[in-house]
Design a protein with these regions (language model features):
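A short acidic, helix-capping loop that chelates divalent metal ions and anchors anionic groups
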Residues: 37-40, 72-77, 110-114, 174-176, ...
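Active-site-proximal loop/turn and secondary-structure-junction residues that shape catalytic pockets
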Residues: 10-14, 35-37, 69-72, 106-110, ...
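N-terminal pre-domain/capping segments
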Residues: 1-91, 95, 99, 257-262
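Soluble or luminal CAZymes and related metallo-dependent hydrolases
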Residues: 15, 44, 48, 82-86, ...
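Short, solvent-exposed loop/turn segments at secondary-structure boundaries
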Residues: 42-46, 75-81, 113-117, 177-178, ...
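Histidine-acidic metal/acid-base catalytic patches
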Residues: 1-5, 13-29, 148-163, 167, ...
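Short beta-strand segments at enzyme active-site cores
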Residues: 32-33, 63-68, 99-106, 139-143, ...
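Active-site acidic/histidine proton-transfer and metal-coordination neighborhood
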Residues: 14-21, 55-58, 74-165, 174
Length: 262
């Protein structure tokens, strides 16, 4: 039985309000927005924020999460104060718009023997966690090309309730990492999960970590959903279409797939 509502991550290069209407028509229960462009905390006025909240309520859509745009890893102190300040503004915006979850790609956890980068990364994420806690939100670190156990160990070491993990099967598969194993390894740290794989990815995918029986980039959906069930994840499954594809086709295809597991 599929216990997860489906969400849709919207494309920041397209008009947001049109996409919200489209998401509702498709049957999505929530959306993920990116804090960039017209939705940047520095550009979205108080009136704009009220109108956006009203539109989401009218369309009966939840704001699953707000995505924090990041251009580089947090393993360097270069312009760190400015980056943390911008993140803090996004945390405040997320809370005001009605979600307590912010997603961000912060880069790989540096190895412990790289002391300088590891210390910079640890201090930066700790600072972000403190800011998130102050704003009443959680910061979910998006999985990428590192094993789930490595991220879990790092999160365990910080032990901050304002930090979490977001499972991105497509990114993991492109890196040759099994999303099923990563989900189980991260366990209760998982606060958000995507529904998608890396088949047809423009960037290509590594050999499938589940063996020769699975094409490159393909996700073992039944095992993935089972792993999320095992760790007690009850949140949204967010569909994140590639900008080059029709989001309606992507969402509908996955919605039909999940019905077969119902």
């Amino acid at each position: 039985m599929i216990r997860h509502a489906l969400g849709l991550r919207l494309d920041s290069s397209r008009p947001v309000r049109d996409q919200i209407h489209e998401a509702a028509r498709l049957g999505a229960r929530g959306v993920v927005l990116e804090a960039i462009g017209d939705l940047s905390p520095l550009r979205l006025s108080e009136t704009g924020r009220r109108e956006l909240r009203h539109l989401l309520r009218t369309m009966e859509l939840s704001l699953v999460a707000l995505s924090l745009p990041t251009r580089r890893s947090f393993d360097t102190t270069d312009q760190l104060d400015d980056r943390i300040r911008r993140a803090d503004l996004a945390f405040a915006l997320a809370y005001e718009l009605g979600t307590n979850l912010v997603l961000a790609r912060v880069g790989q956890v540096p190895p412990e023997d790289d002391r300088e980068r590891r210390e910079a990364f640890t201090n930066a994420i700790s600072s972000l966690g403190q800011r998130a806690d102050h704003r009443g939100v959680r910061l979910a670190l998006e999985t990428g090309s590192e094993p789930g156990q490595r991220l879990k160990t790092f999160l365990d070491s910080l032990d901050m309730v304002s930090l979490a993990a977001s499972i991105d099967p497509a990114s993991l598969l492109r890196g040759g990492i099994d999303p099923v194993a990563a989900s189980r390894e991260l366990g209760t740290w998982v606060a958000h999960a995507y529904a998608g794989d890396a088949t047809g990815s423009a960037g290509g995918a590594a050999p499938n970590p589940r063996g020769l029986g699975f094409p490159a980039g393909a996700l073992d959906w039944e095992e993935y959903l089972g792993a999320l069930e095992e760790i007690g994840y009850r949140g949204f499954l967010t569909v994140w279409p590639d900008p080059s594809e029709d989001p309606r086709v992507r969402f509908t295809t996955l919605a039909l797939r999940f019905k077969r597991f119902g």
